[in-house]
């Protein structure tokens, strides 16, 4: 199993989107940056904010693309290419409509499930979808016509509370990836209940 060398948190740039459901991936990267005591700094050649840290003696880069969600692959592709990071060494954190708020799942590979950020990352990595995903449940509005408005709005207070709890657990589980391995982290996160 490859070691994770790049952790990406997806979201949309700007204050307007900062607290919206679609930015759940960015929320987790910000928590990881605080946990690892590093600052995310703008890096124009990577189209995002980046940080470098050591986790359990291993060098890891954090990335929040500053492109809009549907162009996230531009940032991921640029950084991965520059540092020669393979798709299987990347963990992408993103919001997931098909999971209820307060849940999260880790997995490797798979389709994009209609998520435009994932779709662009797969394309920019040469149609390779073998990267890891940490999917943060945000719930579903009930009908596909409501999805765009739903992901670009703030969660309800109850959902925000559930998200805070699962983000705490996910932060711990990302650290477990580096200490005890992906399988242990996956088993713990995928069985988490609030």
Curated annotation (Swiss-Prot):
Role: Hydrolyzes ribosome-free peptidyl-tRNAs (with 1 or more amino acids incorporated), which drop off the ribosome during protein synthesis, or as a result of ribosome stalling.
Keyword Membrane: no
Compartments in which it is found: Cytoplasm
Family matches, as SUPFAM superfamilies: Peptidyl-tRNA hydrolase-like (SSF53178)
Catalytic activity field: an N-acyl-L-alpha-aminoacyl-tRNA + H2O = an N-acyl-L-amino acid + a tRNA + H(+)
Binding site for tRNA: 17, 68, 70, 116
Discriminates between blocked and unblocked aminoacyl-tRNA, annotated site positions: 12
Keyword check for RNA-binding: yes
A Pfam family reported for this protein in Swiss-Prot or TrEMBL: Pept_tRNA_hydro
HAMAP family reported in the protein's UniProt record: Pept_tRNA_hydro_bact
Family: Belongs to the PTH family.
Stabilizes the basic form of H active site to accept a proton (site feature) positions: 95
MF term (GO), any: peptidyl-tRNA hydrolase activity
Protein name, entry field: Peptidyl-tRNA hydrolase
Keywords: Cytoplasm, Hydrolase, RNA-binding, tRNA-binding
Predominant location category: cytoplasm
EC number: 3.1.1.29
Subunit structure: Monomer.
Cystine bridges: none
PANTHER family named among the record's database cross-references: PEPTIDYL-TRNA HYDROLASE
GO cellular component: cytoplasm
């Amino acid at each position: 199993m490859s070691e994770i060398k790049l952790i990406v948190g997806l979201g949309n740039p700007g204050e307007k989107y900062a607290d919206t459901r679609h930015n759940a991936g960015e929320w987790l990267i910000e928590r990881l940056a605080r946990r690892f005591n590093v600052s995310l700094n703008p890096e124009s050649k990577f189209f995002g904010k980046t940080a470098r840290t050591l986790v359990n003696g291993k060098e890891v880069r954090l990335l929040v693309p500053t492109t809009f969600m549907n162009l996230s692959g531009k940032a991921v592709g640029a950084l991965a290419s520059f540092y020669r990071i393979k798709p299987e060494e990347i963990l992408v954190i993103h919001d997931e409509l098909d999971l209820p708020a307060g849940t999260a799942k880790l997995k490797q590979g798979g389709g994009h499930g209609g998520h435009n950020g994932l779709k662009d990352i797969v394309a920019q990595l040469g149609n390779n979808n073998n990267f890891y995903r940490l999917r943060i449940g945000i719930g579903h509005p009930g009908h596909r016509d409501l999805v765009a408005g739903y992901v670009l709005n703030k969660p309800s207070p109850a959902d925000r509370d559930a998200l805070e709890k699962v983000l705490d657990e996910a932060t711990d589980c990302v650290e477990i990836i580096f200490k005890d391995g992906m399988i242990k982290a996956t088993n713990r996160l995928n069985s988490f209940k609030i």
